[in-house]
Amino acid sequence: MNHEELINSLTKKMNGALQVLDADLKGLRVGQASAYFLDPVQVEAYNSKVPILQVATISVSDTKTILVQVWDKSLVKAVKKAIMEANLGVSIISDDNQIIRLQLPIPSEERRKELVKIAHKYQEKSKIIVRNIRRDGIELIKQMEQNTECSKDEAHIYSKEIQELTDKYCDKIDKIIKLKEQDIINL
């Protein structure tokens, strides 16, 4: 693997860390209803636990209401139970046959602080992923140097480049979390 391929590979992996962070943050409800909000819900259906998206269609009717249209009428109770057990802080306001309406309350000040803490945990998790990618990249540089694929000076330059890439992605993570934090606080 040459220097350019290594940097491209590390960049791709670090972008993956940002995508994981984005997916984690979509699960945090901050003011507006989102179809992603129910992603963590697992429903007991057909003798196994399945994601809610495999048994229902999820849509948003307004900023505070999520509609869950269950495909199989026999699973409506299981879906309601799974939503309640997921502790998402939602209220089931009605269920007309196979459509379940979920009302999202405005988070209290305490809940907002809790959401900020969760966002910071996601931030640290993402930074750890990025740092682990950096560590792996630097290990590869050391191997390249030992195998005389690059000189000591080149290895130093490549390591510095990897560190700069790491700093860039850590800054991106910080900016994403800062925006999310402002969204949470300004509800």
Swiss-Prot record:
<keyword id="KW-0963">Cytoplasm</keyword>
<dbReference type="Pfam" id="PF01765">
    <property type="entry name" value="RRF"/>
</dbReference>
<dbReference type="InterPro" id="IPR036191">
    <property type="entry name" value="RRF_sf"/>
</dbReference>
<protein>
    <recommendedName>
        <fullName>Ribosome-recycling factor</fullName>
    </recommendedName>
</protein>
<dbReference type="GO" id="GO:0005829">
    <property type="term" value="C:cytosol"/>
</dbReference>
<dbReference type="InterPro" id="IPR002661">
    <property type="entry name" value="Ribosome_recyc_fac"/>
</dbReference>
<comment type="function">
    <text>Responsible for the release of ribosomes from messenger RNA at the termination of protein biosynthesis. May increase the efficiency of translation by recycling ribosomes from one round of translation to another.</text>
</comment>
<keyword id="KW-0648">Protein biosynthesis</keyword>
<dbReference type="InterPro" id="IPR023584">
    <property type="entry name" value="Ribosome_recyc_fac_dom"/>
</dbReference>
<dbReference type="GO" id="GO:0043023">
    <property type="term" value="F:ribosomal large subunit binding"/>
</dbReference>
<dbReference type="GO" id="GO:0002184">
    <property type="term" value="P:cytoplasmic translational termination"/>
</dbReference>
<comment type="similarity">
    <text>Belongs to the RRF family.</text>
</comment>
